[in-house]
Amino acid sequence: MTNSDLWKAPDLVPSIQYSDLLRTIEWFERVFCFHERVEARLTWPGGGRAWIEAGSALFNINVAGETGQQDASRIVQGVKMKVYVDDVDQHFSHAKAEGAKIISDPEDGFWGGRIYRVLDHEGHQWEISQRGRDLAADRWRLPPGVTRGVPK
């Protein structure tokens, strides 16, 4: 087996449940300019799975069906996805123009990064961050009341 025969993926690939595979793929491509690994899409009666590339990151989207997957309504809420892009302001303008539900406008964070927050078409929260701006932890300008490190 050669390297070209192997699936290329990062060490961690999050999986997010959705109710409509095709609509979700279209939304990510149109609103966030992400790309599907088309050759890897799987479908089955009532469901499917697709792998989505966001820069060098990879995640998959799942729709429950007859494969024994967990029903989307039973998934615990509270997960936020973070993805890095080259230009937060440009990404924000595009997502907003495409009708994305914006939670917060682009802003500079105490860690040096620039971010905005947005909900996707099914209400999952995404934090879009600008690549190459995050400072080392010892250089963060912490807001009042926030401490660094493990409490003693």
Across the structure, where does each feature detected by a protein language model lie?
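C-terminal catalytic core of tyrosine-transesterase DNA break-rejoin enzymes
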Residues: 122
